[in-house]
UniProtKB/Swiss-Prot annotation:
Keywords, in A-Z order: GTP-binding, Hydrolase, Metal-binding, Nucleotide-binding, One-carbon metabolism, Zinc
This protein's GO CC annotations: cytoplasm
GO BP, one annotated term: tetrahydrofolate biosynthetic process
Quaternary assembly: Toroid-shaped homodecamer, composed of two pentamers of five dimers.
Name the UniProt record assigns to this protein: GTP cyclohydrolase 1
NCBIfam families: folE, PRK09347.1-2, PRK09347.1-3
Family: Belongs to the GTP cyclohydrolase I family.
GO MF entries: GTP binding; GTP cyclohydrolase I activity; zinc ion binding
Enzyme Commission numbers on file: 3.5.4.16
Keyword Transport: no
Organism name: Nitrosospira multiformis (strain ATCC 25196 / NCIMB 11849 / C 71)
Length: 191
């Protein structure tokens, strides 16, 4: 799995370590290039995943359900495209179905699909919402992401603990104040 023209691999990580003044052959670093190569393959696996395949609907008797479906506290782990620094937090997803529902775990898988790419939080939020709208064709979609960004916490302003909140409201959640209020209440509920 060595480096070639199209893949950043073990040899590249060894060169990076040498450029930092490290010896890639020393005890603590010997296996680091291989581990980091595998880690980045994992952290960017979303490029090889298809949201349409994740959001296949199924018939289980829930097709007549016509109230909001909300899943909260979906873990988000991604890397910013500007510094390759991690950002992480939680997502809340809600949608108002029109006969097409998916297993609840599919919402987590969808977040993981888009988060496992180089991202900005704003685009990640929109990609999740647009994908749900396109593949499930619901009356409404709401997505809220709350994340901490290591590019802010470990460099630059270097303030720990700040949280960035982004949202995307589509369909009735964008135009219907009552629906939007219900989604936001369910998203914030601690009961």
């Amino acid at each position: 799995m060595d480096s070639n023209d199209s893949e950043f691999g073990i040899g590249d990580w060894q060169r990076l370590l040498r450029s930092l003044g490290e010896d890639p052959s020393r005890q603590g670093l010997r296996e680091t290039p291989e581990r980091v190569t595998r880690a980045w393959a994992h952290w960017t696996r979303g490029y090889k995943q298809d949201p349409a395949a994740i959001l296949k609907t199924f018939a289980d008797g829930g097709e007549s359900y016509d109230e909001l479906i909300v899943v909260r506290q979906i873990p988000v782990y991604s890397h910013c495209e500007h510094h390759l620094a991690p950002f992480f937090g939680h997502a809340t997803i809600g949608y108002l179905p029109t006969g097409h529902i998916v297993g609840l775990s599919k919402l987590t898988r969808l977040v993981n699909c888009f988060a496992a790419r180089l991202q900005v939080q704003e685009r990640l939020t929109q990609q999740v919402a647009q994908s749900l709208l396109e593949h499930l064709q619901p009356k409404a979609v709401g997505v809220i992401l709350r994340c901490r960004h290591m590019c802010m916490e470990s460099r630059g302003i270097a303030v720990a603990g700040e949280e960035t909140v982004t949202s995307a409201m589509l369909g009735d959640l964008k135009t219907n104040a009552a629906q939007r209020a219900e989604f936001l209440a369910l998203a914030e509920s601690h009961e």
